[in-house]
Protein backbone atom coordinates (compact mmCIF):
# COMPACT_ATOMS: atom_id res chain seq x y z
CA UNK A 1 0.00 0.00 0.00
CA UNK A 2 1.45 3.39 -0.97
CA UNK A 3 0.10 5.27 2.04
CA UNK A 4 3.01 5.61 4.47
CA UNK A 5 2.28 8.47 6.85
CA UNK A 6 4.21 9.46 9.95
CA UNK A 7 2.23 9.86 13.17
CA UNK A 8 2.23 13.65 12.76
CA UNK A 9 1.21 13.45 9.11
CA UNK A 10 -1.63 11.13 10.11
CA UNK A 11 -2.74 13.71 12.68
CA UNK A 12 -2.87 16.47 10.06
CA UNK A 13 -4.79 14.34 7.54
CA UNK A 14 -7.19 13.19 10.26
CA UNK A 15 -7.85 16.79 11.28
CA UNK A 16 -8.58 17.88 7.71
CA UNK A 17 -10.93 14.93 7.15
CA UNK A 18 -12.72 15.72 10.41
CA UNK A 19 -13.05 19.49 9.93
CA UNK A 20 -14.22 19.09 6.33
CA UNK A 21 -17.30 17.32 7.71
CA UNK A 22 -17.85 18.93 11.13
CA UNK A 23 -17.05 22.59 10.29
CA UNK A 24 -17.46 22.90 6.51
CA UNK A 25 -17.83 26.70 6.73
CA UNK A 26 -14.25 26.94 8.08
CA UNK A 27 -12.76 24.46 5.60
CA UNK A 28 -10.18 24.54 3.92
CA UNK A 29 -8.01 25.36 6.95
CA UNK A 30 -5.22 27.86 7.45
CA UNK A 31 -1.88 26.97 9.04
CA UNK A 32 -3.15 28.31 12.36
CA UNK A 33 -6.42 26.39 12.02
CA UNK A 34 -4.55 23.14 11.36
CA UNK A 35 -2.23 23.73 14.32
CA UNK A 36 -5.22 24.29 16.63
CA UNK A 37 -6.94 21.17 15.29
CA UNK A 38 -3.81 19.04 15.74
CA UNK A 39 -3.29 20.20 19.33
CA UNK A 40 -6.95 19.87 20.29
CA UNK A 41 -7.44 18.33 23.76
CA UNK A 42 -10.62 16.42 22.87
CA UNK A 43 -10.92 13.51 20.41
CA UNK A 44 -7.14 13.27 20.11
CA UNK A 45 -4.90 10.46 21.31
CA UNK A 46 -2.19 11.19 22.11
CA UNK A 47 -2.61 14.91 22.74
CA UNK A 48 0.10 16.74 20.79
CA UNK A 49 1.71 20.15 21.18
CA UNK A 50 2.97 20.87 17.68
CA UNK A 51 4.58 24.24 17.02
CA UNK A 52 3.65 26.36 14.01
CA UNK A 53 6.97 25.57 12.33
CA UNK A 54 6.48 21.83 12.91
CA UNK A 55 3.02 21.97 11.34
CA UNK A 56 4.40 23.92 8.38
CA UNK A 57 7.07 21.26 7.82
CA UNK A 58 4.43 18.52 7.92
CA UNK A 59 2.25 20.42 5.44
CA UNK A 60 5.22 20.86 3.08
CA UNK A 61 5.90 17.11 3.19
CA UNK A 62 2.24 16.27 2.54
CA UNK A 63 2.20 18.70 -0.38
CA UNK A 64 5.19 16.88 -1.90
CA UNK A 65 3.34 13.58 -1.47
CA UNK A 66 0.29 15.12 -3.20
CA UNK A 67 -1.94 14.50 -0.18
CA UNK A 68 -2.73 18.24 0.09
CA UNK A 69 -3.21 21.25 -2.10
CA UNK A 70 -3.12 24.95 -1.29
CA UNK A 71 -5.72 27.57 -2.04
CA UNK A 72 -4.75 31.23 -2.17
CA UNK A 73 -5.89 34.40 -3.84
CA UNK A 74 -9.49 35.18 -4.78
CA UNK A 75 -10.06 37.01 -1.50
CA UNK A 76 -8.04 34.62 0.68
CA UNK A 77 -5.52 36.70 2.59
CA UNK A 78 -3.85 33.59 3.99
CA UNK A 79 -2.98 30.27 2.38
CA UNK A 80 -5.56 27.57 3.03
CA UNK A 81 -5.00 23.82 2.85
CA UNK A 82 -7.35 21.07 1.76
CA UNK A 83 -6.64 17.36 1.66
CA UNK A 84 -6.41 15.23 -1.46
CA UNK A 85 -6.13 12.10 0.65
CA UNK A 86 -9.40 10.60 -0.57
CA UNK A 87 -12.34 11.41 -2.83
CA UNK A 88 -10.34 13.99 -4.78
CA UNK A 89 -10.98 14.50 -8.48
CA UNK A 90 -7.92 12.61 -9.69
CA UNK A 91 -7.17 10.55 -6.58
CA UNK A 92 -7.60 6.79 -6.53
CA UNK A 93 -8.79 6.35 -2.94
CA UNK A 94 -12.58 6.60 -2.76
CA UNK A 95 -14.31 6.31 0.61
CA UNK A 96 -17.95 6.49 1.64
CA UNK A 97 -19.05 8.97 4.31
CA UNK A 98 -19.10 6.16 6.86
CA UNK A 99 -15.60 5.04 5.86
CA UNK A 100 -14.27 8.61 6.06
CA UNK A 101 -15.64 8.93 9.60
CA UNK A 102 -14.02 5.67 10.72
CA UNK A 103 -10.68 6.35 9.01
CA UNK A 104 -10.48 9.92 10.35
CA UNK A 105 -11.22 8.78 13.90
CA UNK A 106 -8.61 6.01 13.69
CA UNK A 107 -6.06 8.53 12.40
CA UNK A 108 -6.88 10.89 15.27
CA UNK A 109 -7.14 8.41 18.15
CA UNK A 110 -5.34 5.22 17.15
CA UNK A 111 -6.61 1.71 17.85
CA UNK A 112 -10.24 1.52 19.01
CA UNK A 113 -13.07 -0.98 19.41
CA UNK A 114 -16.15 -0.83 17.15
CA UNK A 115 -18.15 0.43 20.14
CA UNK A 116 -15.71 3.27 20.76
CA UNK A 117 -15.72 4.16 17.07
CA UNK A 118 -19.51 4.32 16.96
CA UNK A 119 -19.52 6.83 19.84
CA UNK A 120 -16.60 8.92 18.64
CA UNK A 121 -17.68 9.24 14.99
CA UNK A 122 -21.14 10.62 15.82
CA UNK A 123 -20.31 14.17 14.68
CA UNK A 124 -19.13 12.88 11.31
CA UNK A 125 -21.54 10.02 10.64
CA UNK A 126 -24.40 8.44 12.55
CA UNK A 127 -24.23 4.66 12.82
CA UNK A 128 -27.43 2.92 13.88
CA UNK A 129 -25.58 0.21 15.78
CA UNK A 130 -22.17 -1.34 16.34
CA UNK A 131 -22.73 -3.93 13.60
CA UNK A 132 -22.73 -1.12 11.01
CA UNK A 133 -19.31 -0.01 12.27
CA UNK A 134 -18.07 -3.60 12.13
CA UNK A 135 -19.26 -3.88 8.53
CA UNK A 136 -17.33 -0.74 7.56
CA UNK A 137 -14.22 -2.11 9.28
CA UNK A 138 -14.63 -5.42 7.46
CA UNK A 139 -14.93 -3.60 4.13
CA UNK A 140 -11.83 -1.50 4.83
CA UNK A 141 -9.82 -4.57 5.78
CA UNK A 142 -10.85 -6.53 2.68
CA UNK A 143 -10.48 -3.91 -0.06
CA UNK A 144 -8.42 -4.86 -3.10
CA UNK A 145 -6.57 -1.52 -2.95
CA UNK A 146 -5.97 -2.02 0.79
CA UNK A 147 -6.14 -3.37 3.36
CA UNK A 148 -6.62 -0.12 5.27
CA UNK A 149 -7.43 -1.47 8.74
CA UNK A 150 -6.49 -4.54 10.76
CA UNK A 151 -8.07 -6.28 13.74
CA UNK A 152 -5.66 -6.42 16.68
CA UNK A 153 -5.40 -9.29 19.13
CA UNK A 154 -7.94 -8.92 21.92
CA UNK A 155 -6.41 -7.57 25.11
CA UNK A 156 -6.72 -9.69 28.27
CA UNK A 157 -9.97 -8.95 30.09
CA UNK A 158 -11.47 -7.02 27.15
CA UNK A 159 -14.71 -8.05 25.45
CA UNK A 160 -14.05 -6.42 22.07
CA UNK A 161 -11.06 -6.48 19.75
CA UNK A 162 -9.58 -3.15 18.71
CA UNK A 163 -8.98 -2.09 15.11
CA UNK A 164 -6.11 0.04 13.81
CA UNK A 165 -5.57 1.82 10.50
CA UNK A 166 -2.66 0.84 8.25
CA UNK A 167 -1.92 4.25 6.74
CA UNK A 168 1.27 4.43 8.83
CA UNK A 169 2.41 0.98 7.73
CA UNK A 170 1.81 -2.57 8.87
CA UNK A 171 1.17 -3.30 12.54
CA UNK A 172 3.67 -5.80 13.98
CA UNK A 173 1.96 -7.85 16.66
CA UNK A 174 4.55 -10.64 16.70
CA UNK A 175 6.22 -9.30 19.88
CA UNK A 176 2.91 -9.48 21.74
CA UNK A 177 2.35 -13.05 20.54
CA UNK A 178 5.92 -13.99 21.41
CA UNK A 179 5.46 -12.51 24.87
CA UNK A 180 2.33 -14.60 25.31
CA UNK A 181 4.21 -17.75 24.27
CA UNK A 182 7.05 -16.87 26.65
CA UNK A 183 4.57 -16.37 29.49
CA UNK A 184 3.03 -19.79 28.81
CA UNK A 185 6.46 -21.45 28.71
CA UNK A 186 7.48 -19.73 31.95
CA UNK A 187 4.26 -20.85 33.66
CA UNK A 188 4.92 -24.44 32.60
CA UNK A 189 8.52 -24.32 33.89
CA UNK A 190 7.41 -22.87 37.23
CA UNK A 191 4.81 -25.63 37.55
CA UNK A 192 7.47 -28.31 36.94
CA UNK A 193 9.80 -26.73 39.51
CA UNK A 194 6.99 -26.52 42.06
CA UNK A 195 6.29 -30.24 41.60
CA UNK A 196 9.98 -31.07 41.99
CA UNK A 197 10.20 -28.99 45.18
CA UNK A 198 7.11 -30.72 46.58
CA UNK A 199 8.67 -34.14 45.84
CA UNK A 200 11.95 -33.11 47.50
CA UNK A 201 10.04 -31.93 50.57
CA UNK A 202 8.28 -35.29 50.77
CA UNK A 203 11.59 -37.16 50.42
CA UNK A 204 13.23 -34.95 53.06
CA UNK A 205 10.30 -35.44 55.42
CA UNK A 206 10.51 -39.21 54.90
CA UNK A 207 14.25 -39.18 55.66
CA UNK A 208 13.71 -37.11 58.79
CA UNK A 209 10.99 -39.43 60.01
CA UNK A 210 13.18 -42.47 59.31
CA UNK A 211 16.06 -40.85 61.22
CA UNK A 212 13.77 -40.19 64.18
CA UNK A 213 12.63 -43.81 64.27
CA UNK A 214 16.23 -45.04 64.05
Curated annotation (Swiss-Prot):
SUPFAM superfamilies from the entry? Winged helix' DNA-binding domain (SSF46785)
InterPro entries from the xrefs? DUF480, WH-like_DNA-bd_sf, WH_DNA-bd_sf
What are the disulphide bonds in this sequence?
none
Which family does the similarity line name?
Belongs to the UPF0502 family.
Name assigned to this protein = UPF0502 protein Spro_2794
Say which species the protein is native to: Serratia proteamaculans (strain 568)
